Design a protein with these regions (language model features):
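Alpha-helical residues within the helix-turn-helix
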Residues: 31, 54-55
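N-terminal helix-turn-helix DNA-binding core of bacterial DNA-binding proteins
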Residues: 4-45
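Beta-hairpin "wing" of winged helix-turn-helix
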Residues: 56-71
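Exposed loop/turn and edge beta-strand positions of beta-sandwich/beta-sheet ligand-binding modules
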Residues: 74
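Amphipathic alpha-helical dimerization/coiled-coil segments
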Residues: 83-113
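Basic amphipathic alpha-helical segments that dock to polyanions
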Residues: 46-48, 52-53
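Short aromatic/hydrophobic contact patches that present stacked aromatics
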Residues: 14, 77-79
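Basic, short loop/linker segments at the boundary and entry of helix-turn-helix/winged-helix-like folds
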Residues: 1-6, 78
Length: 113
């Protein structure tokens, strides 16, 4: 059963929203991911992930103030919901359980062959 489902990029996005806290809007999230992970992110991929996370109820968006630089349109700020926090915790617990289950010998790269 898929209790909470976060794709890899969705997990990166929701973690970044948590990092940015009250400054989590599209371009800021994109830049933070690119800086922290040295990874290029398209605005299309970012938008898709934000829509999916909001559709799942893991985040919510709120309009900010209108700005001239955005031609009067407000930024959309993102916040993690209680359900989103649970999804993040579930994802972390799942990954930690998998890492803990790996036998040390499994990661011994001195394989003779």
């Amino acid at each position: 059963m898929k209790k909470y489902q976060l794709g890899e990029f969705e997990e990166v996005v929701i973690l970044t929203i948590a990092i940015l806290y009250k400054e989590a809007y599209g371009v800021a999230i994109k830049k933070e991911i690119e800086t922290r992970l040295a990874r290029n992110v398209s605005m299309g991929a970012m938008h898709t992930a934000l829509v999916r996370l909001e559709d799942k109820g893991y985040i919510k968006s709120l309009p900010g103030e209108e700005t001239e630089e955005r031609m009067g349109r407000p930024r959309r700020y993102y916040q993690i919901t209680a359900l989103g926090k649970k999804a993040m915790e579930y994802s972390k617990e799942t990954r930690n359980a998998l890492w803990s289950a790996i036998p040390k010998v499994s990661l011994n790269l001195k394989i003779v062959g």
